[in-house]
Amino acid sequence: MSEGTVKENNNEEFNAYHTLTTEEAAEFIGTSLTEGLTQDESLRRLKAVGENTLGDDTKIDYKAMVLHQVCNAMIMVLVISMAISFAVRDWITGGVISFVIAVNVLIGLVQEYKATKTMNSLKNLSSPNAHVIRNGKSETINSKDVVPGDICLVKVGDTIPADLRLIETKNFDTDESLLTGESLPVSKDANLVFGKEEETSVGDRLNLAFSSSAVVKGRAKGIVIKTALNSEIGKIAKSLQGDSGLISRDPSKSWLQNTWISTKKVTGAFLGTNVGTPLHRKLSKLAVLLFWIAVLFAIIVMASQKFDVDKRVAIYAICVALSMIPSSLVVVLTITMSVGAAVMVSRNVIVRKLDSLEALGAVNDICSDKTGTLTQGKMLARQIWIPRFGTITISNSDDPFNPNEGNVSLIPRFSPYEYSHNEDGDVGILQNFKDRLYEKDLPEDIDMDLFQKWLETATLANIATVFKDDATDCWKAHGDPTEIAIQVFATKMDLPHNALTGEKSTNQSNENDQSSLSQHNEKPGSAQFEHIAEFPFDSTVKRMSSVYYNNHNETYNIYGKGAFESIISCCSSWYGKDGVKITPLTDCDVETIRKNVYSLSNEGLRVLGFASKSFTKDQVNDDQLKNITSNRATAESDLVFLGLIGIYDPPRNETAGAVKKFHQAGINVHMLTGDFVGTAKAIAQEVGILPTNLYHYSQEIVDSMVMTGSQFDGLSEEEVDDLPVLPLVIARCSPQTKVRMIEALHRRKKFCAMTGDGVNDSPSLKMANVGIAMGINGSDVSKEASDIVLSDDNFASILNAVEEGRRMTDNIQKFVLQLLAENVAQALYLIIGLVFRDENGKSVFPLSPVEVLWIIVVTSCFPAMGLGLEKAAPDLMDRPPNDSEVGIFTWEVIIDTFAYGIIMTGSCMASFTGSLYGINSGRLGHDCDGTYNSSCRDVYRSRSAAFATMTWCALILAWEVVDMRRSFFRMHPDTDSPVKEFFRSIWGNQFLFWSIIFGFVSAFPVVYIPVINDKVFLHKPIGAEWGLAIAFTIAFWIGAELYKCGKRRYFKTQRAHNSENDLERSSKHDPFEAYSTSTTLQSEINISVKH
């Protein structure tokens, strides 16, 4: 590739620099390894590719945002309602609706502002300065001026300014948790070159360093290969910017098809029918439907008057149209969600976007990062193998820093490999190993000195410190997480580093916490070991070692630890033959040790080896000693292999229980991690994400359940869609792998949540239907990209969020049913009312416009809020997730809406006609839709009766929909008395109770207060008509109870006809049972038995 090409496209097409040697990379990008770029060339490239930033600060277009907030179906219905309210001079209702519109617009402004903060938080991650070589000279420049081809120098404490192909490394480690989510530093090696035919994930490209990663050790030099949005961190920023995707430019379609698709998308976005959460999309579609029904009803009214439209006909048409608009719906929805968000705070869940609350009820898949989310993000020693001594296991340790927690046991003589393949079952596990060790209560045929040698090595080949903070009385640690895990075990065995060296650690424990071993060994007033030299961990050799002088026996000792292959290459002997004498290490011995390494690795443990050697002053002269302490190769030769340790990042205590409850609630959990596949698989099995008995499943299923990021990314969309099951574990995955997983779930019509805490999780957090970030350890970027933040970083808190989401969805369904049933009742009632004609042949209002608004906005609003506060049903988390496609508008809800609406219409119409023709003379008068005159007495009194009936029926309906099937009088069948049960039902939700009482009482002043009654509401005080209102309200209650009784009988019959299927749904199965070969075999056996 020519320099010109490189300049123009910033190498965005080429992503395989890890497969090139340093010389090939320099030639490819057009730079000199020694001289770097010239000033002229760097300026030319800067002009061509742009500054090394993640884009300009996102500006908020307030006008566009306000327009976007107003121009959707729900808000437009509110605007129309507001206009109608002001048209009929109902200033209070108009003012309330205006306030709701303003709140919605304000929420939109706040959310857009937070979205801008998300991007700006990412942009601030980049390093402000960079050290580069140009014209053969080292200079410091602003990081935004770095261009592809620059030779960049980085050292400890620097933030890498761009993606680099490393050309020199010296003990170079970087923190890539921003990209991979893994907390352990990554050792880099410039000399590595990966094969072009093999797939290498971002986290495994050890010859590259990535923009915004922190240098934690050493120094390095590299060629800048990617800048700005083309870097790995830039790809995350680009994905967070989003794309409206409203304009279709599909080359496979004609311009006419693209135009039609674009028009549909733009219209849907304008009305809110194809954006937002499922509930908001459904409500937007409902609003559009109700809008056109309202228009149709208004036309019907005018048609009934032969389109002779005067002011009264227009008002009647507006009244009928208004009856179809649930004006208080958005008010109640917003307030209910706000209250729900406040409740969530007390359950350690912070809701950033109210929409996400109802979305949680539909979640059926959760994709979670591992490190720090499912696990503690800290390392813990789990198994130790010392040849001929046995295997030490550490269990029940919850605090990785606390050496006083956990049980230590010994499996004498057995290695991990032998123990895992033992069929006898009785291996003689010794509990309380520490007490037995110091009481010398161990089997006679094992040598305690083997453990003492290993423990000394583990303690001294280590620079981490573990101490008890006097101020907080808590155990703390400093150092590398791996070394901390080893040092905690050493402290647990009463042999901390400072006990042997005499070094002081900050806030170290008092004398009572000091080791019994150290008290036994250490001479008064002097340290046993004196530190001579250290060979630090090197990414090339993958080990470290320390040289100490033992003041007690006057010997020099070299203690080493590191990756197994690295340590074993330095060893020439071990104690593995008889546990007493040092014997040469043969190839067969190495293979035996390697089997144990694999055995520990298969349990998800990170395995390290330990070795040592010692010699006296008499065995070396001064020159030889100097060579040993200064020459790594000499010091780390002819070591004696001592044993292995397996450490791991333990799951959070509550994770397994949370996963089990998610499965019980019909929610699948997927682990997407940057860790190695063995570790990820073991943790997933430990917490229940994967089944432990994988041998019960076909190989195809097992291969689909567990994949690496490279394997998953290597599949086409069609191949992913053809998988029998989407991966439950993806190891070594990149940010784009997580995004692809979310996309795959969406193609399977799954409604998913994504949890995470790092910058690398941000794109998937944003793409998921619900993004859940961690509040304590989460980055600002992940929080800003999320919908929900867990304030305690507790995976189990997601259960609280899901439960609250389901409760809220249930309650939203209840008050939507209540409000829409009232709309149906009012609309039918007013349409039927067209048959009532006055003496001039004009239709008479059976309800006035203000009466309609009063019932919709005032009477129904507070009970609807009360329904939004209903407690969760006992079986809420035993049900399957809500259907995100159907949402709250199930067939049952739709039928209930019309059923209750028709019953209410009948009751109100009976009350109106009973009053008009039964109690009164039946005269309809003239001009009774405007101002009162003497001929309107009967109409005005009948309106009062109908108004009271509809008001009270609406309130009774609120109680009836608390449970969609149970009788209101049998809500709590466990109560010992029907009277107690009734009062328990009405008093259980006190807000709802007082709302209904207020609604009942409010009917009286509205009917009796002068001026307000006849001038505003167009009705008059009544007497005997109250009896009719009460009677037909009771009739409505009876009708509603009979309808629910019919529903119960119907569903009972359905269950009887589908008993086997119902039993299948109600049982709590292993979520993996459908894929088990043993289940398939059992099904075949059952079928054969039946036949």
Swiss-Prot record:
Cofactor(s) required for function per UniProt: Mg(2+)
Region of interest (Disordered), ranges: 499-525
Superkingdom to which the source organism belongs: Eukaryota
Catalysed reactions listed for this entry: Na(+)(in) + ATP + H2O = Na(+)(out) + ADP + phosphate + H(+); K(+)(in) + ATP + H2O = K(+)(out) + ADP + phosphate + H(+)
Keywords, ordered alphabetically: ATP-binding, Cell membrane, Ion transport, Magnesium, Membrane, Metal-binding, Nucleotide-binding, Potassium, Potassium transport, Sodium, Sodium transport, Translocase, Transmembrane, Transmembrane helix, Transport
Active site residues of this protein: D369
Amino acids binding Mg(2+): D369, T371, D757
Cell compartments where the protein resides: Cell membrane
PTM entry text: The active site is phosphorylated in presence of sodium or potassium and in conditions of higher pH. Not phosphorylated in presence of calcium ions.
PROSITE patterns: ATPASE_E1_E2
Chain intervals with Polar residues compositional bias: 503-519
Transmembrane segments: 64-84, 91-111, 283-303, 313-333, 816-836, 849-869, 886-906, 944-964, 992-1012, 1022-1042
Pfam family, one: Cation_ATPase_C
Cytoplasmic domain ranges by topology: 1-63, 112-282, 334-815, 870-885, 965-991, 1043-1091
InterPro entries: ATPase_P-typ_cation-transptr_C, ATPase_P-typ_cation-transptr_N, ATPase_P-typ_cyto_dom_N, ATPase_P-typ_P_site, ATPase_P-typ_TM_dom_sf, ATPase_P-typ_transduc_dom_A_sf, HAD-like_sf, HAD_sf
Broad class of the protein's primary localization: membrane
Key word tRNA-binding present: no
Gene Ontology MF, one: P-type potassium transmembrane transporter activity
Its membrane topology: Multi-pass membrane protein
Enzyme Commission number: 7.2.2.3
Extra remark beyond the main annotation: Present with 606 molecules/cell in log phase SD medium.
Family: Belongs to the cation transport ATPase (P-type) (TC 3.A.3) family. Type IID subfamily.
Protein's name in the database: Sodium/potassium exporting P-type ATPase 5
Organism: Saccharomyces cerevisiae (strain ATCC 204508 / S288c)
Record gene name: ENA5
